[in-house]
């Protein structure tokens, strides 16, 4: 099975851009699975559409959509809609894996955001025995959030594949620069890339940006 689960240390850290960058560089057939899209109305483009816009041809699958920008379980309850359950997400990933070389499962928010009454993205990773890539922001406060995410993965016996900074500022401050050294230490996982802020602005240049910003383990050429 070639499934990679992508989570973040929180919202707006660049998960979708990182997912698109990995998809853009991956050889073979790629599927992107978004279990629950929140904060997007019917008919509007969601995260999987953004991945396809940036990465090119991928199989894009969205299991559920809720209009309010809330945690999936809360958004489903308020919409009067059924929640997405981790078992459903895992089964959808397995089905996609049968016909694709890589399946990227993008979470909503952080690792322990609830999909239903108790299930989270961590439960999806456990069910799939899949590694998890953590997307973090680069600035002050990221070390604690990244360390807690890695600790939650270890407690469940899930491999933390690495950390990627999803939106690196054009003028990084001292905290940002120090965090590049400290993130691998506090998570016990390799730093696998740093994507610049605004990476999604130009789809024509996105492949080059992805290649420059991701480490060889993810198909790029970035290194510390």
Curated annotation (Swiss-Prot):
Its EC number is 6.3.3.3. The active site is at residue 34. Mg(2+) binds at residues 16, 47, 106. Keywords: ATP-binding, Biotin biosynthesis, Cytoplasm, Ligase, Magnesium, Metal-binding, Nucleotide-binding. Disulfide bonds: none annotated. GO terms for molecular function: ATP binding; dethiobiotin synthase activity; magnesium ion binding. It comes from the Bacteria. SUPFAM superfamilies: P-loop containing nucleoside triphosphate hydrolases (SSF52540). InterPro entries: DTB_synth_BioD, P-loop_NTPase. It is found in: Cytoplasm. This is ATP-dependent dethiobiotin synthetase BioD.
